[in-house]
Amino acid sequence: MILERIVTDNLPDLERRKMRLPLAKLQELVLDIPYLPIDMAMKLKGRQVRLIAEVKKASPSKGIIRPDFDPVDIAGIYARNGASAISVLTEEHHFMGSLDNLKKIRESGVASKLPLLRKDFIHDPYQVYESRLYGADAILLIVAMLSPERLQELLSLSHKLGMKCLVEVHTRSELEIALESNARIIGLNNRDLHTFKIDLTVTERLRPLIPPECIVVSESGIQTRADISRLEELGVDAVLVGEALTASVDIAAKMRELL
């Protein structure tokens, strides 16, 4: 299964990072960060559907999506053209991302008013702390790869550090776990992470089951304005779009088309 392989492939890298920067030292550095995270939940509420634009170089299903990849330049385009938040893929082996990309975007100031979402396969408290250190305002938590107990632990730690969580589900049973954990930003992933197949009806089936106090984000497979209009009718608050933007010759023009 693709999800399991991605997690396994990244375990040695995580252990090396722990060796280079032990948890106790990482925690000290996080405590010294002078600024508070930007509230992603506040940015995703509104009368119109909000856009989380993703900085994405490659994927397991498509390979390299954007050969001339400049994460800071792309984030700047997103910030200038209506994005409400920016998702930054940091997984290295299958998506060609990096934590350094997240850090560069934060330190560049090109998106200083927008929350940065670290999109990765997070399963260890160490990753939550390092997300904060590298400039994330929010993190992705995938229910399919976490026990309910670990999900709750990571949610609580993230909130303690001031970060919001996009809690991602693909099935009704995963949604029930997310809601039981009191997740407030729910991501409905139209992509099955075990097969990487897309099905936009996932959002259609699961959206009615989510209470009104939650923020609902539809993820994956969103290519056109018609897709977004359909999701808007279903009552989602935001959409997360990556490939359709980074694969475009003119990213700004594609954003104008979608919004």
Curated annotation (Swiss-Prot):
Matches recorded under InterPro entries: Aldolase_TIM, Indole-3-glycerol_P_synth, Indole-3-glycerol_P_synth_dom, Indole-3-GlycerolPSynthase_CS, RibuloseP-bd_barrel
Superkingdom of this protein's organism: Bacteria
Entries under SUPFAM superfamilies matching the protein: Ribulose-phoshate binding barrel
EC number: 4.1.1.48
Pathway: Amino-acid biosynthesis; L-tryptophan biosynthesis; L-tryptophan from chorismate: step 4/5
One of the record's GO molecular function terms: indole-3-glycerol-phosphate synthase activity
Key words of the record: Amino-acid biosynthesis, Aromatic amino acid biosynthesis, Decarboxylase, Lyase, Tryptophan biosynthesis
Annotated CDD domains: IGPS
Catalytic activity of the protein: 1-(2-carboxyphenylamino)-1-deoxy-D-ribulose 5-phosphate + H(+) = (1S,2R)-1-C-(indol-3-yl)glycerol 3-phosphate + CO2 + H2O
Family membership noted in the UniProt record: Belongs to the TrpC family.
Protein name, as recorded: Indole-3-glycerol phosphate synthase
